[in-house]
Amino acid sequence: MEPRPEFTVIAGPNGAGKSRLCPFYIRTASFDGDKLMLQLRKDHPEWPDRWISGSVVSELEKQKTKALTEKKDFAFETNFSSDMAVRMVHDFKESGFKTSLYYFGLSSEEDSVSRVIHRMQTGGHDVTDEVIRFNFREGLRNIQQNLRLFENITFIDGNSDYGHIVALHIEKGHIHEVEDNPPQWFVDQFENLFKELNTQSV
């Protein structure tokens, strides 16, 4: 039997290191909407924001449909702050894909804002404070509410230079591990939910 194709979500707040660190964890090239948006703004400075946003969504849907049709691995980088991101997980799961989550965590909205400011000062792309805070709150809420959709889950400390793994859950391998002294963001945001995953898989 051929292995199931895999849908991977690389999630976390702005500034958590998703783009920088995810290549160390997954082999599949990920769809990065922020990167495409920046390129479109550079190529088409005359376009209004709604055209650019629409083009990004259109390209994502195109690549998603291709992956579903061809049963090919697909990876998606996101703040997970939109209903569209949640629907994508359902769509791939219902099509028989293995679902995996790599979540890069930060402690607070302020931490996310400060890291984006630092990134911008070193040549990275900017995001408004309002968007950063929305993405932090809604992305966290959506992940917490939909954690059970994922068969494999890896929590990574966004404050670490090299993507330190905090917790790991692999459903079929019966692996459920948390490091001895996890960062406070994991304790506050996910510790109890993560324990429930282990109870359900027993």
Which functions belong to the PLM regions below?
Residues F7-V9:
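Short hydrophobic/aromatic beta-strand immediately N-terminal to the Walker A/P-loop
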Residues K18:
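Conserved lysine of the Walker
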Residues M1-R4, A67-L68:
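Phosphate-binding P-loop
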Residues I52-L106, G139:
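Glycine-rich phosphate-binding loop used to anchor ATP phosphates in small-molecule kinases
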Residues P13-N14:
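The conserved Walker
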